[in-house]
């Protein structure tokens, strides 16, 4: 939740830098889970903190990736807000979820391990092959993970391994869940519109266009051009008559704090072409832009994490997490939380009026 650290060495390639952003998010989730901000028994199964370099000072055990209170609180609010939107999608009869740039995310397992799991038809996670490969290995290694890969209506986990691994270990498929290795970006010589062909060729076969579908994009679009991210939103809006999208983004990168964030990202060989959507209003407007044509969503909204803290989390939950760690700098917390936003768009009658 803070501007990304500058202590990791600069990535040699921008894709390596993207991988490091997943490390940041996964280690933040692990920290929040270990300290009691989140209930997530799967975070430690899908992510392991990197071993310290030989001779490096390691004041904490490798298995405990503790983050500062500011990051833990931000991770809680991010998870709280997105979870509420996902739950409301499911309560309206949502059947399919596509997580773009899923990385080490645990949401599928958190959903399916509930006492009453949702009646999902398909859950698809997409990321670069060098990120899906270790995730597929971890899923295959832990029964606590692969036991949930069967049909969602199955009361008991199926015997054996309910999945297949393909594409050199980078893809894992089951009747309910697919981990798909895919680079959504067109080549430099291709137009942004070619993203639609990529999605139609690789992703659509995993889904049923007749079913209400949600796509999630957490900290993905900032690293894509506005044209590319618009094509993704447009494709979902055109392909599914009943659809919802949820994005988690950085905003306000043109102020002094935002400039610090950009400089720290630049040190790590990361640019943010999507930063032109600098306000919650402009983030929501991506779903209803006339440029989407037939893929335009019916309604949209957005809230900063600070607004979610003030309006949605609730006093009992805020009191609970306030007892976990001492956090004195509320103004600093507000500054950070106002630079992150959750935006959503809905299309179709059964998805109408979903919001935070």
Curated annotation (Swiss-Prot):
One of its GO terms (molecular function) is protein C-terminal leucine carboxyl O-methyltransferase activity. Keywords: Methyltransferase, S-adenosyl-L-methionine, Transferase. The gene is PPM1. The keyword Plastid does not apply. This is Leucine carboxyl methyltransferase 1. It catalyses: [phosphatase 2A protein]-C-terminal L-leucine + S-adenosyl-L-methionine = [phosphatase 2A protein]-C-terminal L-leucine methyl ester + S-adenosyl-L-homocysteine. Belongs to the methyltransferase superfamily. LCMT family. Methylates the carboxyl group of the C-terminal leucine residue of protein phosphatase 2A catalytic subunits to form alpha-leucine ester residues. SUPFAM superfamilies: S-adenosyl-L-methionine-dependent methyltransferases. S-adenosyl-L-methionine binds at residues 78, 101, 127, 183-184, 218. One of its GO terms (biological process) is methylation. It holds the Pfam family LCM. The keyword Methyltransferase applies. Its EC number is 2.1.1.233.
